[in-house]
């Protein structure tokens, strides 16, 4: 298989384009400019709010004007990580992709399919005039990965749609009603420093080799957590 064989062709065409545009969280200026240029090229109404969220509107197919307006949403930032032996600047360098068996992968870095594939899907729909649809609004939010700040910054009236479909999911062909949710906790405590008694030793404790998983999609599986495991041993006294 080659990249040109990937289907749907329109989706992967735009995904490859997106991979050429650096888009770290909180540094989305280049991908915002790309989206604005896309909207202008296709003569679609495009606007950007104060946070950097982008909305591109596409009128309904003739005869579909009375359907409810649908909002398609994805986020334009990505998690930026690389292997230790890879030289890559996420602020300037494109993501290099390759086919590995049946998978499209990045060469030594994160791929950015979260949520680049959602962005590419929206762009493919906006660019394809053969798809019949009602009034359509495509929303591209910033800074999802480090706090959902783009989504939180949305103001009433920026969109007008009655239905919103978020395209940032894990499993193809499935629709979820609801979300995983999240909680932020701030814990504080006071402590008193004491001298280390004679005969005591310092130890460095590492917890590694765990299976890991997504805190939203895998939280219910009971897997080991490297933050919690060391704490569970603090009450023990070594012989």
Residue spans of the language-model regions?
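Conserved active-site and cofactor/substrate-binding residues in soluble primary-metabolism enzymes
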Residues: 6-13, 26, 30, 34, ...
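Acidic/His- and Gly-rich active-site-bordering loop/insert found
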Residues: 2-102
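Fold-level recognition of mixed alpha/beta catalytic cores in primary-metabolism enzymes, strongest
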Residues: 137-213, 217-222, 226
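Conserved small/polar residues in nucleotide/adenosyl-binding loops
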Residues: 234-239
């Amino acid at each position: 298989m080659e990249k040109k064989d990937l289907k749907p062709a329109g989706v992967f065409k735009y995904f490859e384009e997106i991979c050429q545009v650096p888009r770290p969280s909180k540094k989305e200026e280049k991908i915002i400019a790309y989206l604005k240029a896309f909207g202008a090229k296709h003569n679609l109404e495009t606007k950007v709010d104060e946070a950097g969220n982008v909305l591109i509107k596409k009128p309904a197919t003739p005869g579909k004007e009375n359907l409810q307006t649908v909002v398609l949403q994805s986020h334009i930032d990505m998690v930026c990580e690389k292997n230790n032996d890879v030289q890559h600047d996420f602020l300037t360098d494109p993501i290099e992709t390759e086919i590995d068996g049946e998978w499209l992968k990045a060469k030594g870095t994160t791929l950015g399919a979260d949520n680049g594939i959602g962005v590419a899907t929206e762009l493919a729909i906006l660019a394809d005039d053969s798809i019949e649809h009602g009034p359509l609004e495509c929303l591209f939010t910033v800074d999802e990965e480090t706090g959902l700040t783009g989504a939180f910054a949305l103001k009433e009236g920026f969109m007008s749609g009655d239905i919103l479909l978020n395209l940032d999911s894990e499993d193809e062909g499935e629709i979820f009603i609801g979300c995983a949710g999240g909680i932020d906790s701030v814990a504080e405590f006071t402590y008193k420093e004491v001298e280390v008694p004679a005969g005591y030793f310092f130890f460095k404790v590492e917890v590694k080799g765990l299976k890991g998983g997504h805190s939203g999609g895998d939280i219910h599986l009971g897997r080991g957590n490297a933050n919690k495991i060391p704490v569970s041993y603090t009450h023990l006294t070594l012989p």
